[in-house]
Amino acid sequence: MACLWSFSWPSCFLSLLLLLLQLSCSYAGQFRVIGPGYPIRALVGDEAELPCRISPGKNATGMEVGWYRSPFSRVVHLYRNGKDQDAEQAPEYRGRTELLKETISEGKVTLRIQNVRFSDEGGYTCFFRDHSYQEEAAMELKVEDPFYWVNPGVLTLIALVPTILLQVPVGLVFLFLQHRLRGKLRAEVENLHRTFDPHFLRVPCWKITLFVIVPVLGPLVALIICYNWLHRRLAGQFLEELRNPF
């Protein structure tokens, strides 16, 4: 009001200009950090990418950028002084993270987590720090089993398919050999009846068939048993690795 009463318009204009300049300087370093806004989904053993950016966009090459998790603010990945600070990472993330910096000059970065584990599921916090000013954004990672949509009964059936496919041709071979051996044994028995006394052969026909078939099918049955054992063992190891990759 003093300016109005004294009609000192140049001094009023200069005061207003200085005020605007002071306000612009105080807000020059401020920005907002924006996350994806929705849960990021990844399969166990696969890769997950967590995007993060600042608004308004600006060159973040000289800033400190990082991700951490609660509790105890465990460092997932940290970028400072123009390079990654791997030594400050939590042990469970060492060698498994990568900061994609192709668009860091625009204020956009992405954290890539490799070989995702079930323990990686949960909340993450991304932050940008420019000197003493820092802003953060929260995001969530959901980890899913590759076979989460499959009923356990279906998994059991899938595991048994190779065994069934092997046993079908084995059964056909068994029936074929049984038919051939029966015909051959019947002819030999008839010849023996013609040559020797009928009372000489008192051994039942099924026993003769058994004595001939067992030496033929014995190794085949052993092979089937070994295959089933090996298949169950490998299937168990595969499912265990899916649940506990490390």
Curated annotation (Swiss-Prot):
As for subcellular location, the record says: Membrane
What kind of membrane protein is this, topologically? Multi-pass membrane protein
Q: Which residues form the signal peptide?
A: 1-28
Tissues expressing this chain = Found exclusively in the CNS, where it is localized on the surface of myelin and oligodendrocyte cytoplasmic membranes. Reduced expression levels are observed in jimpy and quacking dysmyelinating mutant mice.
Domain named Ig-like V-type: residues: 31-144
Tell me which UniProt keywords the record has, alphabetically: Cell adhesion, Disulfide bond, Glycoprotein, Immunoglobulin domain, Membrane, Signal, Transmembrane, Transmembrane helix
Keyword Electron transport recorded: no
Q: At which residues is glycosylation annotated? A: 59
PROSITE patterns (UniProt xref): IG_LIKE
InterPro entries, alphabetically? Answer: Ig-like_dom, Ig-like_dom_sf, Ig-like_fold, Ig_sub, Ig_V-set, IgSF_BTN/MOG, Myelin-oligodendrocyte_glycop
Give each disulfide bond as a residue pair: 52-126
According to its UniProt entry, one GO biological process term is:
cell adhesion
On the Extracellular side, which residues? 29-156, 231-246
Record's Gene Ontology CC terms?
Answer: membrane; myelin sheath
Q: Which residues lie on this side of the membrane: Cytoplasmic?
A: 178-209
Q: How does it assemble?
A: Homodimer.
Output this protein's name.
Myelin-oligodendrocyte glycoprotein
Q: Could you tell me which species this protein originates from? A: Mus musculus
